[in-house]
Amino acid sequence: MGCGACCILWVQSFTMTVVYGADIGLIHQQLNQLLNPAACKQVWFQDVNKLYDVVLNQNLFAEDTKPILIHNCSFLEKNNLTKAELHCLKTLKDTDVVVTIYSDSPANALINDRAITKYACKPVTAKTIHQVISKAAKTLKLNLNPDLIDHLATILPFNLGVIEQELRKLTLLSPAELQDKKMLEAVLCDYQTSQILQLTDAMVRLQTAKALKLIERLFLPKQLTPPQFLEFLANELLLALMVKGVKPQAVFQLQWNVNPFRLKAIQSQYRFWSTNQLTALINAIWQLDIKIKRNDGLAIHLLKHFVLRFFAQK
């Protein structure tokens, strides 16, 4: 699966091309189909003024001019563009430039402009993940049977970049080890963010039995340590505090180094938790982290006790 239909050569046409989507792995896949990123002048977006200067100073008529590749052009994620942003967009449209936007919903001004070439990177879903894994495995010359692909589809997150990175680990295994599901989980599940999210979701939804069962699954095979989970949860609660008073649509305008879709999901998940409750839980996490590091052998017991206290907060 990819965002584009075929591989094409880059042609000097002085037009703006946009590649967008929430999965950065898919964005890079599309870029490699469109052009050779190494042959471009690569720029990471910081602010509109700096970007405008880079584009304005580009000598379009020089023989050695390279197309510009602008990564994570975040100002084009929002609909209410300022005058300066609109002016920058107009300049980009008259430039030999490729822009990436890490969002499934870029600005309407961009989407509705027929003069801009656009490539939408559709996210990996439950319907497509088997195909994505099969294609990535084929590229890496991994011989995975359908049963193995089914198993991988249950433990890998829906993100091409992560899938490719994890499958590269499997190239180091022998054919016999590839058929051993326990070996696969030991290699691939060092830090299962998807399962951590399941645990935090169960806690927020007050599903006590499910949360305790997930703790057994996460920590007993040693694929994740309790302090790692606590660090993840504390960061999530801090983000929940930070977006507490932000309007849902304004989340996409925040200039934070966090995926806005994750921020919106966190905001929705913790919407019924008060500021005092979130603060108390963060303090409890810090205290528990110290206890666990002093009593490593009791880590699972202490974590289960913490989860039960978590539910008591509600």
From Swiss-Prot:
Reaction(s) the record says it catalyses: DNA(n) + a 2'-deoxyribonucleoside 5'-triphosphate = DNA(n+1) + diphosphate
Keyword field: DNA replication, DNA-directed DNA polymerase, Nucleotidyltransferase, Transferase
GO biological process: DNA-templated DNA replication
Protein name listed in UniProt: Probable DNA polymerase III subunit delta
Transmembrane stretches, start-end: none
Functional description taken from the UniProt entry: Part of the beta sliding clamp loading complex, which hydrolyzes ATP to load the beta clamp onto primed DNA to form the DNA replication pre-initiation complex. DNA polymerase III is a complex, multichain enzyme responsible for most of the replicative synthesis in bacteria. This DNA polymerase also exhibits 3'-5' exonuclease activity. The delta subunit is the wrench that will open the beta subunit dimer.
Family statement: Belongs to the DNA polymerase HolA subunit family.
InterPro entries: DNA_pol3_clamp-load_cplx_C, DNA_pol3_delta-like_C, DNA_polIII_delta, Intein_C
GO cellular component: DNA polymerase III complex
Cysteine disulfide links: none
Subunit relationships: Component of the DNA clamp loading complex consisting of tau(3):delta(1):delta'(1). The DNA polymerase III holoenzyme complex contains at least 10 different subunits organized into 3 functionally essential subassemblies: the Pol III core, the beta sliding clamp processivity factor and the clamp-loading complex. The Pol III core (subunits alpha, epsilon and theta) contains the polymerase and the 3'-5' exonuclease proofreading activities. The polymerase is tethered to the template via the dimeric beta sliding clamp processivity factor.
Pfam family for this entry, one: DNA_pol3_delta_C
Molecular functions per Gene Ontology: DNA binding; DNA-directed DNA polymerase activity
Enzyme class: transferase
Source species of the chain: Mycoplasma pneumoniae (strain ATCC 29342 / M129 / Subtype 1)
Domain of life: Bacteria
Enzyme Commission number(s) from the entry: 2.7.7.7
